[in-house]
From Swiss-Prot:
Zn(2+) binds at residues 79, 238, 242. This is UDP-3-O-acyl-N-acetylglucosamine deacetylase. GO terms for biological process: lipid A biosynthetic process. InterPro entries: Ribosomal_Su5_D2-typ_SF, UDP-acyl_GlcNac_deAcase, UDP-acyl_GlcNac_deAcase_C, UDP-acyl_N-AcGlcN_deAcase_N. The gene is lpxC.
Amino acid sequence: MIFQRTVQKMVKATGVGLHSGNKVTLSIMPAPVNTGIVLVRTDLSPAVAIPAKAEQVRETTMCTALVNDEGIRISTIEHLFAALAGLGIDNAVIEVDAPEIPIMDGSASPFVFLLQSAGIKEQAAPKKYLKIKRPVRVEDGDKWAELKPFKGFRVNFKIDFAHPEIARSQQHVVMDFSTSAFVKEISRARTFGFMRDIEYLRANNLALGGSMENAVVLDEYRVLNPDGLRYEDEFVKHKILDAFGDLYVAGHAILGEFTAYKTGHALNNQLVRALLAQQDAWELVSFEKEADVPVSFSVPSGAVFA
């Protein structure tokens, strides 16, 4: 039996909000089986809980944001959710004392470290996977994203930027997911942005917390960060990281192949919504025997922490 997972103990971290520039404290706590991921705004009185579900994603401009019916939001969830997905955390309560998750270093790596520090605990209930039964596709102009059947979880992602530095890098990655591959090859990829856009955003009181400490910054020709890139193909890998986080609002790890061209938060969420709306396109499955589990999910998360 493959079991659901939560964290063993509460852990906290403090960072800055990407858009506000203000200090943000984040706490991750264990949760009972079948809870899913629930985010809680503790800066409000009373505190407001928002379950992480696809229909709660109501803002996808520059980030993924959960918004409840009263308009209360928690923004920039995607890097944290990529870490939760990558380490196979099914259940957790996440408290934050601000309208956004701290940006940390612009990747999922600090959240991976935080979850590893908390420890991962198996729970007395079967883990459920969302198995793709037939292709589901969404399009927006020349951009598109698709989920189709596959035994495991494979990502086939291509970006297309005319910027000379990005054009020189590899812009197409195909990888079979595993916790180890996520931690080593994807989790450290940082968000990236262009100086021309940053100047405009700050003039409009956005990206006030953005800096070279938490993003790859480019001018018209090159990367401006003194230490350069973490991966030769960091740009496309960060887009994969974002997609991991965006897809996890489906509520379960996906068994299927995710293929995408030039997608972002909006199209990723549209794909999840389209999938869940077509109930003949998926089913929830569990695995009684570990031998039956696809290789992508067969190694417990803790195995890569030793």
